[in-house]
Amino acid sequence: EDIIEKTNLKLERSKKIEQLSKGYKQRVGLAAALIHTPDILILDEPTTGLDPNQLVEIRNLIKEIGKNKIVLLSTHIIQEIPKICNKIIIINKGKIVENRDMDEFNKQGVNLENHFHRLTS
């Protein structure tokens, strides 16, 4: 019940998964991942294909979950990183090429997208 409330699925709980929007399907995935109270939550492209409202809701939900758990987020949507993450690790060809707090990027005024392309090209 707590997970249903946390993921805002209460009104959708009686629907079949195929009846849900992409955003609610993402929420169901998060709820399923949270059932066994993992210490670490691994999310692969959790904001892909969401409409603007769903995007904000899922971002906020991930940030809220991140207050109590380690959340590893895999994404190719560079603009999402500073909106969700407090640390960035860039992996290129199986090797870590960057491992830094987002605060450092912000203080130094680094353009994350350009930095990513420089490290991975």
Regions found by a protein language model. Name each.
Residues 95-117:
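Conserved beta-strand-loop-alpha-helix hinge in the C-terminal portion
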Residues 1-73, 78-92, 97-98:
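ABC transporter nucleotide-binding domains
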Residues 25, 117-118:
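Compositionally biased, intrinsically disordered low-complexity regions enriched in proline and serine
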